[in-house]
Design a protein with these regions (language model features):
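Conserved C-terminal beta-signal and adjacent last beta-strands/turns
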Residues: 71, 77-80, 84-91, 126-188
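Membrane-spanning beta-strand positions in outer-membrane beta-barrel proteins
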Residues: 2, 8, 12-18, 85-87, ...
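Outer-membrane beta-barrel translocator domains and adjoining extracellular loop/strand segments
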Residues: 27-34, 99-107, 161-168
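Short, solvent-exposed micro-motifs at the edges of structured domains
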Residues: 75, 107-108, 115-117, 121, ...
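Extracytoplasmic loops and strand-loop junctions of Gram-negative outer membrane beta-barrel proteins
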Residues: 1, 44, 52-61, 101, ...
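Transmembrane beta-barrel architecture of outer-membrane proteins
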Residues: 1, 11, 19-25, 35-37, ...
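Long, well-ordered mid-to-C-terminal structural blocks that present hydrophobic/aromatic surfaces
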Residues: 90-95, 105-107, 111
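Outer membrane beta-barrel strand-and-loop segments of large Gram-negative receptors
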Residues: 19-87, 101
């Protein structure tokens, strides 16, 4: 489900807004890493299968459903100072990803005393829900005249969480500043 609008009241200004809601049933991705070095039940299953040189297994699974909600907004405004062009672009994105269903533990592990509780581990769930900033925004200005141009941009990225089976680490919001000066050598 999505909805959007575009508005251009003049040749020098435009605004777009997009909303979206995406539900995926039986999403396919890599499931939990079933590690035999830390779980004796997994080690026994691997050994019983003749896989004595393998410490763990991971495989694609469709063991979850996900929901993504988001908003994209972009605005562009152009000025005409003298012989040049001055563009301002403001962009904003908010995206929230959520795991809405996880399959239970594979049948081969049920009731065997394994430390695993579902087909997914915290790393996989985190990668979907929190491993990328939930918001991003930028303000860019670009001046050009003839073959010459100058660009400046400030970007803001919201917090995100990275992790492994050893734990999760939260990184706070960050801002980046960048710029560019250019000259076109070929004909305009």
């Amino acid at each position: 489900l999505s909805a959007g609008m575009a508005w251009s009241p003049t040749n020098d200004f435009n605004l777009t807004v997009d909303l979206y809601n995406i539900n995926i049933t039986d999403r396919i991705l890599l499931g939990a890493t079933f590690d035999g070095s830390s779980d004796p039940v997994i080690a026994k299953i691997l050994a019983d299968s003749g896989l004595t040189q393998i410490a763990g297994v991971q495989f694609p699974t469709n063991a979850l459903d996900t929901k993504t909600n988001g908003l994209d907004v972009a605005a562009n405004y152009r000025l005409h100072p003298g012989a040049g062009l001055l563009d301002f672009t403001l962009a904003f994105n908010f995206t929230k990803n959520e795991v809405t269903r996880i399959d239970p533990l594979p049948a081969i592990l049920v009731g065997k005393g394994s430390s695993y509780t579902s087909a997914l581990d915290i790393v996989t769930i985190n990668a979907i829900e929190k491993n990328r900033p939930d918001r991003r925004s930028s303000l860019t200005s670009n001046y050009s005249q003839g073959r010459f141009h100058v660009m400046g941009r400030i970007s803001d990225y919201g917090k995100f969480v990275d992790g492994s089976l050893d734990g999760l680490e939260t990184f706070g919001a960050k801002q980046l500043f960048d710029g560019e000066i250019g000259y076109r050598w070929d004909a305009i």
